[in-house]
């Protein structure tokens, strides 16, 4: 085995690519590492196309092994299970920039598996996996128009930072990942703390320029270790079949694409498609239906794109920069903590907010350590939203990705846990969909959060932009429909407030998208966002002053950290009894901060009084009302404040001589006692004699 190694500096890090030693039966395999974070990436490509294959079967799997961080998995089986949400998102991050680089007509099955085998807690594996996948595909010889580079851009102290460490990311106002070839940006995924459009574009350009180091290094690596390029030629278009499809369908499709209502339009297009297939297969039974459908789809694209470039109205009759009609309702569900319905044309989100306590936080067991997430965002896309039947169950990759994008859009305006001590969960139910449901989720979430009384910094709106480019002509479209997304050259989603951008996601299918085109798209998106925010502010302009009557009230109090053990009790008995008796939830931090949550305010007052009682200090000279807990020959033990027991010696029970304690006291009897002394060991000496004046004494009733 003679491994081939390529090493290069990338910003503040050293990247190493190695091939030839491991997984030699795969089409290509690369061990990619960046400062001790190592990802092993394999590519297997099938030489033959499956019969009847009519789409490109590319699969990307990303998996993290716990041994990479020197840990053993939890749970009963002690091995890794199904991919986590984070793993799914990184798999999508790898997939998105490489998918457009395979030529049209290439239908061979390809599987990319990226496995994290070593992790440095300061270096995120996602970037390493993207670089490794690019290198492995480039080595494999498959018809891949790469390589791509990938860069993470931070924004710290008004400066862009290339590939910031985990520690630096905590100080950064931006987390942007950009991927592209030497000529073009292909993908952007970002979250920002309300930056301007100009700053966001500058970050994209900066990241693309910096990643050229990676692209050049992979090219050199391929020159040394690459396999021969596949002798693959794109299938010749069947001119005769194309002409037949056009003759039958072109005019009818042109009319169908003037129908503004989605369902009616789809029914018409499906009928035309069925007619085309029936007519052509009747003439020639050997013609594949898949081939006819591909030509039909290409014709649809040609018609829609041609009209847009020619300046004609869009599918639903709008101009290029018009946003569809908006309809907003807040407070739509009576018992939830906050809710809103946001409708934009034929896209609709029912957003619901639930407030919980810190114990509702999600604990994420990641390779870099355990952390808590106090803001949860879940996106559901049921089949009825597009008028179809289908499987209902655990979220698919797309739902996870859209939920994370919507969360990124809203995260910048959320209060910290110290400002608003609630765990917040937002669920966006997509009840109708015709383009840009993730951005509808951002708008719906912003409205529902305000309805719930969450003190968000400002309203947030999201908009999806599209682009159609033919040669030197291009048109940027605001608020794209599903068809425009599918048939266009760019999907460009922007979320933000009136003052700046909170999230930007870009997927570009072609080369030649210049920074100037991106700037036009960002400016057009800003105008659309301002329009949507204006309508949203008419519905609800600020967070409600009070949270829902059905939401838990959280009250905080401080106790001496040394007293925490007293409140918890032996084996948690005291705190458990308190929560069960009052129906509250109690959380205690190490610094002595006690958070009590309950829907019933009176229950909270009871708990606070009990905790004050438990943690109260016994004062010498003070008089307390206590209960006799046990009797002894030499005196009686009395529980006073906080269930602290003191001894009333037999000589201190009465003014006269006492022969037998039980003649004067019984267990459970309430008595008034005065604290005579607290010795060094904390033992309390009590008396029932000479209690003094009530004005000078402290009387506390103690409940057992």
From Swiss-Prot:
It is found in: Cytoplasm. Keywords: Cytoplasm, Magnesium, Metal-binding, Nucleotidyltransferase, RNA-binding, Transferase. The keyword Endoplasmic reticulum does not apply. It comes from the Bacteria. It holds the Pfam family S1. It catalyses: RNA(n+1) + phosphate = RNA(n) + a ribonucleoside 5'-diphosphate. Its main location: cytoplasm. GO terms for cellular component: cytosol. One of its GO terms (molecular function) is RNA binding. SUPFAM superfamilies: Eukaryotic type KH-domain (KH-domain type I), Nucleic acid-binding proteins, Polynucleotide phosphorylase/guanosine pentaphosphate synthase (PNPase/GPSI), domain 3, Ribonuclease PH domain 2-like, Ribosomal protein S5 domain 2-like. It is an enzyme of class 2 (transferase). Its EC number is 2.7.7.8. Mg(2+) binds at residues 485, 491. Signal peptide: none annotated. Residues 552-611 form the KH domain. One of its GO terms (biological process) is mRNA catabolic process. InterPro entries: ExoRNase_PH_dom1, ExoRNase_PH_dom2, ExoRNase_PH_dom2_sf, KH_dom, KH_dom_type_1, KH_dom_type_1_sf, NA-bd_OB-fold, PNPase. Residues 621-689 form the S1 motif domain. Involved in mRNA degradation. Catalyzes the phosphorolysis of single-stranded polyribonucleotides processively in the 3'- to 5'-direction. HAMAP family: PNPase. Belongs to the polyribonucleotide nucleotidyltransferase family. Component of the RNA degradosome, which is a multiprotein complex involved in RNA processing and mRNA degradation. This is Polyribonucleotide nucleotidyltransferase. It comes from Mannheimia succiniciproducens (strain KCTC 0769BP / MBEL55E). The gene is pnp.
């Amino acid at each position: 085995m003679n491994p081939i190694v390529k090493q290069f500096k990338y910003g503040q890090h050293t990247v190493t690519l190695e091939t030839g030693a491991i997984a030699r039966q795969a089409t290509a395999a690369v061990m990619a590492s960046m400062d001790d974070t190592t990802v092993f990436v394999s590519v297997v490509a099938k030489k033959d196309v499956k019969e009847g294959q009519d789409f490109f079967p590319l699969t990307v799997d990303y998996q993290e092994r716990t041994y990479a961080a020197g840990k053993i998995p939890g749970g009963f089986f002690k091995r890794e299970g199904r991919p986590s949400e984070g793993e799914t998102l990184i798999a999508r991050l790898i997939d998105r920039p490489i998918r457009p680089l395979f030529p049209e007509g290439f239908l061979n099955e390809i599987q990319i598996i990226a496995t994290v085998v070593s992790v440095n807690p300061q270096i995120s594996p996602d970037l390493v996996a993207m670089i490794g996948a690019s290198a492995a595909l480039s080595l494999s010889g498959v018809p891949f128009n790469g390589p791509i580079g990938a860069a993470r851009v931070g924004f710290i102290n008004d400066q862009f930072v290339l590939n910031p460490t985990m520690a630096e990311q905590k100080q950064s106002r931006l987390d942007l990942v950009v991927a592209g070839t030497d000529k073009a940006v292909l993908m952007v995924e970002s979250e920002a703390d309300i930056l301007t459009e100009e700053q966001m574009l500058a970050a994209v350009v900066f990241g693309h320029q910096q990643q050229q180091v990676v692209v050049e290094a992979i090219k050199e690596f391929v020159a040394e270790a690459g396999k021969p390029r596949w002798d693959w030629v794109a299938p010749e278009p069947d001119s005769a079949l194309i002409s037949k499809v056009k003759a039958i369908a072109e005019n009818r499709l042109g009319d169908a694409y003037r129908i503004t209502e989605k369902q009616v339009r789809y029914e018409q297009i499906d009928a035309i498609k069925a007619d085309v297939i029936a007519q052509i297969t009747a003439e020639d039974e050997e013609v594949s239906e898949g081939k006819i459908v591909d030509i039909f789809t290409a014709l649809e694209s040609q018609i829609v794109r041609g009209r847009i470039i020619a300046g004609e109205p869009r599918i639903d009759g709008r101009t290029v920069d018009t946003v569809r009609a908006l309809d907003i309702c807040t407070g739509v569900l009576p018992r939830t903590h906050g809710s809103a319905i946001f409708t934009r044309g034929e896209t609709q989100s029912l957003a619901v907010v639930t407030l919980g306590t810190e114990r509702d936080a999600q604990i994420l067991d990641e390779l870099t350590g355990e952390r808590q997430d106090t803001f949860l965002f879940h996106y559901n896309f049921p089949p009825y939203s597009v008028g179809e039947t289908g499987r209902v169950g655990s979220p698919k990759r797309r739902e996870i990705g859209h939920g994370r994008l919507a969360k990124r859009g809203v995260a910048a305006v959320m209060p910290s846990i110290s400002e608003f001590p609630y765990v917040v969960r937002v669920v966006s139910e997509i009840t109708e969909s015709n383009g840009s449901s993730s951005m509808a989720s951002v708008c719906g979430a912003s409205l529902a959060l305000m309805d719930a009384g969450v003190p968000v910094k400002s309203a947030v709106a999201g908009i999806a932009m599209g682009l159609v480019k033919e040669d030197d002509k291009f048109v940027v479209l605001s608020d794209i429909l599903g068809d425009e997304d599918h048939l266009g050259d760019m999907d460009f989603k922007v979320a933000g407030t009136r003052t700046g951008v909170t999230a930007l996601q870009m997927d570009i299918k072609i080369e030649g998208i210049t920074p100037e085109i991106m700037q036009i798209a960002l400016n057009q998106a800003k105008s659309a966002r301002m329009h949507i925010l204006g309508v949203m502010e008419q519905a609800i302009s600020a967070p409600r002053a009070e949270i829902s009557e059905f939401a838990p009230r959280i009250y905080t109090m401080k106790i001496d950290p040394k007293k925490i053990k007293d409140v918890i009790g032996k084996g948690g008995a005291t705190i458990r009894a308190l929560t069960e008796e009052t129906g509250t939830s109690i959380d205690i931090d190490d610094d002595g901060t006690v958070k009590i949550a309950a829907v019933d305010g009176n229950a909270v007052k009871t708990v606070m009084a009990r905790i004050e009682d438990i943690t109260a200090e016994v004062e010498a000279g003070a008089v307390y009302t206590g209960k006799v807990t046990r009797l002894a020959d030499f005196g009686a033990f009395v529980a006073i404040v906080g269930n602290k027991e003191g001894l009333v010696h037999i000589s201190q029970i009465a003014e006269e001589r006492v022969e037998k304690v039980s003649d004067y006291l019984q267990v459970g009897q309430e008595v008034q006692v005065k604290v005579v002394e607290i010795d060094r060991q904390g033992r309390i000496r009590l008396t029932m004699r000479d209690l003094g004046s009530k004005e000078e004494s402290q009387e506390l009733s103690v409940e057992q």
